[in-house]
């Protein structure tokens, strides 16, 4: 919800952020990223450039690195893409389609290689990597059974995509039947659907002549062409496909990444001819520099270079961290900049009440995307002060009317990197934060204190559920794709229902049909009987929901998708989770210890849950909601291993694998890895130097294994 305000203050560097400021900014950035993910992955209509988006993720990751205790699932580091749009049948990926972490400087690449060397406990950095241009297109997974194409699905949110099989069959680059020998019975080939620059220009000429929509860039045109209900439209569009990865495979035909690339070619796929095998960090960086120099001459858009560990067995050992693999990284190209005029500054009130100043720009093209909004972070940032009190932009403040330099290096909404003082008009106005919330209630504004007890730069509305801006943001999260995923209740419809008083809390959505005799929604302009019936049907179809989605939909601070999933798997059922939450809210030490023992759950999340369920208003909302829906128990780990579903603790020194590798292996086999021992712990793997955790295991009678016994148990 946007509202105009007056003057304002600037933003701080990550190194200067206090814990309180970091917590607030992480939540704000997470919400921004969610909106941009939806516009990019679902709507094929991004409002920011890739560089701007990357900058946002950079800042978010930097804050999380400095404050690891604040890592939550709402962080961009915990998410992949966006949930399927609902226009196509949903397809669950047998192997998740995760995204790569980003590198923006040579030092990032060196750190990436160093982490791999340490993880694998290698004596040197002599590792082979495949290197290839990062195509700016639409990720696709093609499933073949018995050599025949059976399903084509988009990335979606990484776990679930959209079925676009009929459309994919129209692409010449996608074989209907795989060629060659040693083709596995089940084979998922992954790659990128793209459109060449030449084809993009020709398509836009035809669109313009026909009076149809003009696409912003080749990526949007490729995505829009593929996600057509009518396959003949897709067939008329010149789309290409590069194969570069795989998902579920009943057998691996090759032992290396580059070997798989050649195997794809033998099967009938096109692969990027610029792919190379590199043997050192220096070769990786040299390849990046060469591709950047050749970038303008290529007939397709790229936004960086991808590096992957070549040995597949090493990829499997390295595994994943949340949403990204340890064995791969995308080395992005430098950001692009442009100058434009800052026309106004508006205050955005987030779901948690935090104020974010958003600059409204004279529209300007940056890297092929029209940019109209820019995040100004907080008061200090606007004043030219960084997070640690350092000077930004040589002390130049930002005023309404200024000519500013914006950069699309990664901020979801681009960032202002400078102000052109020579162009500052006499009418330029300083911006000051409002003293009250811009909502109709004009509730008071509070400031989060710094670690030194001083007033911070982050402003927050104190109205909480009384503030209509916060209420509506909670409802938007509730109906979002990652939560209840209710079709027909978009932002505009939900805002209308909220303004009219039809929906004030989540349970109201499920009682709309009962109340419609009085509300008469079909008489509202733009609705009609058919639209209302469809809406009620969509709502009815969402009365049954998975536990992890329900927990996420509650909108508790610091409980995003990843955390919600960890809680759901930890407790199994709503009854068990709800009971634990009520006990935690009352300060029950045993309940808090049990929750703390869950993977990815720490003090910050526990406090947030305690605060939420300690508030009677929230308990009432939950009670009314649970009367309207059925909450499905969490799925059990899909693994036949001896440790599936067990809670494991590693302690002491491990000699045959790193601690990270041991944790990744256990989780891959369906186990839960905890950092502390409790009576609910199933196994403790103890190496030399094991101390208090081993003592706790003996105290609780928990089974203790040596490293060799652990490896034998898991069959490695």
From Swiss-Prot:
SUPFAM superfamilies xrefs: BRCT domain (SSF52113), DNA ligase/mRNA capping enzyme, catalytic domain (SSF56091), Nucleic acid-binding proteins (SSF50249), RuvA domain 2-like (SSF47781)
Catalytic activity: NAD(+) + (deoxyribonucleotide)n-3'-hydroxyl + 5'-phospho-(deoxyribonucleotide)m = (deoxyribonucleotide)n+m + AMP + beta-nicotinamide D-nucleotide
Alphabetized SMART domains for the sequence: BRCT, LIGANc
Xref: InterPro entries: BRCT_dom, BRCT_dom_sf, DisA/LigA_HHH, DNA_ligase, DNA_ligase_AS, DNAligase_adenylation, DNAligase_N, NA-bd_OB-fold
List of catalytic residues: 134
Binding site for NAD(+): 50-54, 99-100, 132, 155, 192, 308, 332
Entry EC no(s): 6.5.1.2
Similarity comment: Belongs to the NAD-dependent DNA ligase family. LigA subfamily.
Annotated positions binding Zn(2+): 437, 439, 461, 467
GO molecular function annotation: DNA ligase (NAD+) activity; metal ion binding
UniProtKB keywords: DNA damage, DNA repair, DNA replication, Ligase, Magnesium, Manganese, Metal-binding, NAD, Zinc
Family annotation (Gene3D superfamilies): 5' to 3' exonuclease, C-terminal subdomain, 6.20.10.30, BRCT domain, DNA ligase/mRNA capping enzyme, Helix hairpin bin, Nucleic acid-binding proteins
Gene Ontology biological process terms, A to Z: DNA repair; DNA replication
Annotated HAMAP family: DNA_ligase_A
PROSITE patterns, A to Z: BRCT, DNA_LIGASE_N1
Gene (name only): ligA
A GO cellular-component term linked to this record: cytosol
This protein's name: DNA ligase
Keyword Zinc: yes
Function, as annotated: DNA ligase that catalyzes the formation of phosphodiester linkages between 5'-phosphoryl and 3'-hydroxyl groups in double-stranded DNA using NAD as a coenzyme and as the energy source for the reaction. It is essential for DNA replication and repair of damaged DNA.
Cofactors: Mg(2+); Mn(2+)
Domain BRCT as annotated: residue spans: 638-716
Pfam families, alphabetized: BRCT, DNA_ligase_aden, DNA_ligase_OB, HHH_2
